[in-house]
């Protein structure tokens, strides 16, 4: 919750006028949280961890011990693509995957998105929906989908659609081709239960929601205002 809450609330939530406080909306400096987010304990640490998972999974792929190992590898690649996008969107060019050792080369955002979209397509195509995933549960391994490999494919294809749209700002032709390629699968998130999400919990853990703090004041949205104005014949 530390940086996830504060980076969101002090920066983006403030700028979007979802909360009455300073931050980006007033030019206030909360760079300490940004520094934490991009540090080895958080953003870069997350990427290092998933890179290690992909590395181990790739090494074991030639001689897997369990039927779900290939799918775990592909799920890790999909998650890594998302983590890379978060870092790149927030901080700009970052080193490519598996390059956080020694002197690294920072890639452009366009190159990063090319890698992400290609990685998502390849990983989704290698998931085996018939593999026994019964040992993979939300409590231990898969907080999103409880081991449902088919939903990871939908997640990957949906991310491809999202990232293709982001590419449109710099290369419309490439973005159009990437979007249409993902859309042609006709296999992406369409229902609420397919969304990659975790149940928010109380307390101070990694699964706590950033919008659920008792001290976190919420500004009323226009949508809610429109719903309640005139409700029951009473003016708002």
Each language-model region and where it sits:
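Short, well-structured active-site flanking segments
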Residues: 88-98, 125, 171-181
């Amino acid at each position: 919750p530390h940086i996830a809450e504060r980076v969101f609330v002090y920066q983006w939530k403030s700028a979007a006028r979802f909360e009455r406080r300073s931050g980006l909306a007033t030019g206030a400096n909360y760079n300490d949280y940004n520094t934490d987010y991009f540090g080895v304990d958080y953003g870069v640490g997350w990427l290092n961890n998933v890179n290690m998972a992909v590395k181990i999974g790739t090494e074991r792929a030639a001689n897997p011990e369990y039927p779900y190992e290939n799918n775990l590898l592909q799920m890790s690649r999909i998650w890594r693509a998302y983590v890379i996008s978060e870092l790149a969107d927030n901080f700009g060019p970052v080193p490519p995957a598996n390059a956080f050792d020694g002197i690294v080369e920072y890639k452009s955002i366009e190159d990063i998105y090319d890698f992400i979209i290609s990685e998502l397509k390849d990983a989704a195509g290698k998931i085996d929906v018939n593999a026994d995933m019964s040992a993979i549960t939300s409590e231990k391994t898969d907080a999103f989908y409880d081991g449902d490999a088919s939903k990871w494919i939908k997640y990957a294809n949906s991310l491809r659609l999202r990232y293709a749209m982001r590419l449109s700002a710099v290369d419309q032709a490439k973005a159009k081709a990437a979007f249409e390629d993902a859309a042609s699968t006709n296999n992406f998130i369409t229902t609420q239960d397919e969304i990659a999400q975790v149940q928010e919990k109380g307390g101070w853990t990694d699964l706590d929601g950033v919008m659920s703090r008792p001290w976190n004041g919420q500004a009323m949205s226009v949508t809610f205002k429109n719903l309640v104005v005139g409700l029951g014949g009473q003016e708002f």
